[in-house]
Curated annotation (Swiss-Prot):
Organism lineage: Bacteria, Pseudomonadati, Pseudomonadota, Gammaproteobacteria, Pseudomonadales
UniProt family annotation: Belongs to the EPSP synthase family. MurA subfamily.
PANTHER family: UDP-N-ACETYLGLUCOSAMINE 1-CARBOXYVINYLTRANSFERASE
A single GO cellular-component term on record: cytoplasm
Organism: Pseudomonas syringae pv. tomato (strain ATCC BAA-871 / DC3000)
This protein's UniProt keywords: Cell cycle, Cell division, Cell shape, Cell wall biogenesis/degradation, Cytoplasm, Peptidoglycan synthesis, Pyruvate, Transferase
Protein name (database record): UDP-N-acetylglucosamine 1-carboxyvinyltransferase
Enzyme class: transferase
Keyword match Transferase: yes
GO biological process: cell division; cell wall organization; peptidoglycan biosynthetic process; regulation of cell shape; UDP-N-acetylgalactosamine biosynthetic process
Active site positions, chain numbering: C117 (proton donor)
Cited function: Cell wall formation. Adds enolpyruvyl to UDP-N-acetylglucosamine.
Binding residues for UDP-N-acetyl-alpha-D-glucosamine: R93, R122, P123, V124, D125, L126, D308, I330
Length: 421
């Protein structure tokens, strides 16, 4: 198993390019199954989950054509099987996203219950209930979701999400694009990745209004055609590198990104004492060598502070001046990295869904273990500022969400290297 070794104490300085958003690319790849012609998706990040999704398509009989820039052309007309097997699905929660498109386009699907990060309960019942509202007949047996469309296809439905669900919104929106009649999704997720998926569906000919608000209206169409589409930049990768620069007292310019979808994070970085400047597709952060000030953070659905940036801000508070509270309202069990940070000397108390972080001037390098994707990013950030060497184990978690993390950090001056397991 690969490990990262990081020697801390270097002030980050430089420029990097941001990759395409994994959380946008995965639903967009799933949505290509709705097309009745070839579709090209550009700006895919080079990540394990993306490779797994493309491999899943290969198992179904679709032969994706990939170029060296990781654009992929997919022609779903060659599909031979409508089963998403457990051995592929178990490593990736996003595999549930093929359920809606397959039922809508081909009338049936068999998808293994998904795996992925071990963060609390992420139930798939909203996906199932949404499709049932559209007339699908669904059984969950033997670890598989088996779904069939009614005769004549899925029907438009009015569906209210009991809790805001990004993948639930995406799955039902995709299915509704080819359903008969109008669907209205209430309490829908407003995340930029949902908007990106809607824009891709619209590029294929879907009729969707209200993406980015909590009510999305979809008028089903008979067919969706070919399209070429560029995946949006990754706002969480963007935020992670900005926090890394802030923690080390450095300066970084991130390019090929979008400041408008990261406003809650940028405001908190300014509150921590960072100088932040933005352009149309870039953000520059400069700490001028200062130590950050501790900030209070409360996660909530977009446009509020994103849960996927919570762990990084615990790292920021751990070396900041003062004390900051980080309240997690989206997922339970999302403070697993705190116990690894204790090994580096961080002063963090967890009380329920709140982490109280008292900043310390010095963290010490130590052997630590990544527990999930974003938690592993927080360990990397802490290691960048710690005295001595930090060895991070189980970094396959990092590779699920960050493209070439060591190369990008090296470009900013970090002393980081990968050691093959």
């Amino acid at each position: 198993m690969d490990k990262l070794i990081i020697t801390g104490g270097v002030r980050l300085d430089g420029e990097i390019r941001i990759s395409g958003a994994k959380n946008s690319a995965l639903p967009i790849l799933a949505a290509t199954l709705l097309a009745d012609g070839p579709v090209t998706v550009q700006n895919l990040p080079h990540l394990h989950d993306i490779t797994t999704m493309i491999e899943l398509f290969g198992r179904m009989g679709i032969e994706p054509v990939i170029d060296e820039k990781l654009s992929v052309e997919i022609d779903p007309r060659t599909i031979k099987t409508l089963i998403a097997p457990y051995e592929l699905v178990k490593t990736m929660r996003a595999s549930i996203l093929v359920l809606g498109p397959m039922v809508a386009r081909f009338g049936e699907a068999e998808v293994a219950l998904p795996g992925g990060c071990a963060i609390g309960s992420r139930p798939v019942d909203l996906h199932i209930r949404g499709l049932e509202a559209m007339g699908a007949i669904i059984d969950v047996e033997g670890g598989y979701i088996k779904a069939k469309a009614p005769e004549g296809g899925l029907r438009g439905a009015h569906f209210f999400f009991d809790t805001v669900s990004v993948t639930g919104t995406e799955n039902i929106m995709m299915a509704a694009s080819l359903a008969n009649g109008r669907s209205v999704l209430e309490n829908a997720a407003r995340e930029p990745e949902v908007v990106d998926l809607a824009n891709f569906l619209i590029a294929m000919g879907a009729k969707i209004h209200g993406a980015g608000t909590d009510t999305i209206t979809i008028d089903g169409v008979k067919r969706l055609g070919s399209a070429t589409y560029k995946v949006m930049p990754d706002r969480i990768e963007t935020g992670t590198y900005l926090v890394a620069a802030a923690v080390t007292g450095g300066r970084v310019k991130v390019k090929d990104t979008d400041p408008t979808i990261l406003e809650a994070v940028l405001l908190k970085l300014q509150e921590a004492g960072a100088e932040v400047t933005t352009g149309e597709d870039w953000i520059e952060l400069n700490m001028h060598g200062k130590r950050p000030k501790a900030v209070n953070v409360r996660t909530a659905p977009y446009p509020a502070f994103p849960t996927d940036m919570q762990a990084q801000f615990i790292s920021l508070n751990a070396i900041a001046e003062g004390t900051g509270a980080v309240i997690e309202t989206i997922f339970e069990n999302r403070f697993m990295h705190v116990y690894e940070m204790h090994r580096m000397g961080a002063q963090i108390q967890v009380e329920g869904n709140t982490a109280i972080v008292t900043g310390t001037e010095v963290l010490k390098g130590a052997p630590v273990m990544a527990t999930d994707l974003r938690a592993s990013a927080s360990l990397v950030i802490s290691a960048l500022v710690a005295q001595g060497d930090t060895l991070i184990d189980r970094i396959y978690h990092i590779d699920r969400g960050y493209e070439c993390i060591e190369e990008k950090l090296q470009m900013l001056g970090a002393k980081i290297r990968r050691v093959p397991g």
